[in-house]
């Protein structure tokens, strides 16, 4: 299958640069994957499309302020780190720019010297392995010095760090937010529970690989990035109970979808499990775990539009995206939402 089959024209002004004041007031497109029928609504009305006995599966990862701006210890030259993956207590895999300044053995200073980094090695994808030196708790140092690593297509500075977190974010570890969850407020989640819909939490720490473009023209040749997930025994049992009783499993976001499809058996039952997943879902994939998906509007030719095309049908998705552009829906991380059922 060709990457170009997932291309669509997107005017730049439709790329949302900041979140709406009221999370749940974003627009909602409802796509029936069997008929291709489309409805338009507001996210806070999502309860109209849910039924008692359904189960929403949400990703409770928390974004860390993983972007660090510092300077080279000897020359003072500016450097930017983005933390990707913790290897041990003080060692991380990072992205760095400009890369030419980050040679093995070089050291960098952040803040007023509260954090110092030494380059230990390079990685296959052009990143670096670094060791950090600091006093106290690393997370506290990072919270003081780091910035939210918002996606490259967002040019505005984020005024409030909390707006790039879901209201239920709990476990730190992501370099990007699971953005479908940004539309939920505490009040809306409570309303959903009151109507007899379960909310179950799993964890997948989102990596920056989620923004990595597909460079291969034949998409089957694309190498997917790895992300760490945790599905607890309690979460697996709750989801499996819904499956047994005939309710629908609705994944909130592509990250929840990736996780559930990774841990599901052939009958769609979920196993308690943790580990790394590099699952790549594109048209032709047979879904085992989910009956519905809540998701944002994704980049042309991205792995995410390929995943939603696998779930709803490529023709349905490309037509829905064409309508979304015509109706001026807001796209990407801070944009509007789609419910596929």
Curated annotation (Swiss-Prot):
Which pathway does UniProt place it in?
tRNA modification; tRNA-queuosine biosynthesis
Question: Which GO biological process categories is it annotated with?
Answer: queuosine biosynthetic process; tRNA wobble guanine modification
Which keywords has UniProt assigned to this entry? Cytoplasm, Queuosine biosynthesis, S-adenosyl-L-methionine, Transferase
Q: Which reaction does it catalyse?
A: 7-aminomethyl-7-carbaguanosine(34) in tRNA + S-adenosyl-L-methionine = epoxyqueuosine(34) in tRNA + adenine + L-methionine + 2 H(+)
Q: Which InterPro entries match?
A: QueA, QueA_dom1, QueA_dom2, QueA_sf
What are the transmembrane regions?
Answer: none
Q: Which domain of life is it from?
A: Bacteria
Q: Tell me which Gene3D superfamilies the record gives.
A: QueA-like (3.40.1780.10)
Q: Name the GO cellular-component terms.
A: cytoplasm
Q: Where in the cell is it found?
A: Cytoplasm
EC number of the protein:
2.4.99.17
Q: Which GO terms describe its molecular function?
A: S-adenosylmethionine:tRNA ribosyltransferase-isomerase activity
Quaternary organization: Monomer.
Q: Which family does it belong to?
A: Belongs to the QueA family.
Q: What does this protein do?
A: Transfers and isomerizes the ribose moiety from AdoMet to the 7-aminomethyl group of 7-deazaguanine (preQ1-tRNA) to give epoxyqueuosine (oQ-tRNA).
How is this protein named in the record?
Answer: S-adenosylmethionine:tRNA ribosyltransferase-isomerase
Organism this protein belongs to? Thermoanaerobacter pseudethanolicus (strain ATCC 33223 / 39E) (Clostridium thermohydrosulfuricum)
The coding gene here is: queA
């Amino acid at each position: 299958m060709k990457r170009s089959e997932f291309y669509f024209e997107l005017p730049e002004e439709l790329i949302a640069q900041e979140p709406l004041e009221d999370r749940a007031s974003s627009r909602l497109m409802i796509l029936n994957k069997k008929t291709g029928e489309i409805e338009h609504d507001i996210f806070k009305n999502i309860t109209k499309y849910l039924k008692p006995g359904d189960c929403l599966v949400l990703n409770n990862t928390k974004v860390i302020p993983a972007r660090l701006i510092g300077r080279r210890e000897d020359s003072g030259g500016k450097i930017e780190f983005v933390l990707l993956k913790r290897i041990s207590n003080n060692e991380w895999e990072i992205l760095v720019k400009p890369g030419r300044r980050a040679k093995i053995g070089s050291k960098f200073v952040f803040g007023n010297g509260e954090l110092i980094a030494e380059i230990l090695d390079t990685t296959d994808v052009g990143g670096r392995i670094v060791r950090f030196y600091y006093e106290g708790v690393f997370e506290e140092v990072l919270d003081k010095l780091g910035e939210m690593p918002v996606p490259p297509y967002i040019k505005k500075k984020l005024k409030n760090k909390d707006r790039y977190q879901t209201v239920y974010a709990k476990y730190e570890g992501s370099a990007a937010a699971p953005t479908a969850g940004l539309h939920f407020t505490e009040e809306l989640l409570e309303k959903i529970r009151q109507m007899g819909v379960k909310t179950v939490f799993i964890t997948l720490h989102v990596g920056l690989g989620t923004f990595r473009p597909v460079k291969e023209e034949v998409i089957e040749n694309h190498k997917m990035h790895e992300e760490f997930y945790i599905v607890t025994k309690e979460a697996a049992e709750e989801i499996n109970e819904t499956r047994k009783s005939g309710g629908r499993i609705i994944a909130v976001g592509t990250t929840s979808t990736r996780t559930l499809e990774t841990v599901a058996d052939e009958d769609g039952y979920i196993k308690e499990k943790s580990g790394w997943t590099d699952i790549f879902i594109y048209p032709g994939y047979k879904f085992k775990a989910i009956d519905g998906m809540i998701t944002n509007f994704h980049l042309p030719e991205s792995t995410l539009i390929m995943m939603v095309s696998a779930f709803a049908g490529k023709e349905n998705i490309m037509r829905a995206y064409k309508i979304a552009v015509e109706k001026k829906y807001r796209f990407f991380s801070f944009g509007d939402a789609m419910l596929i059922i």
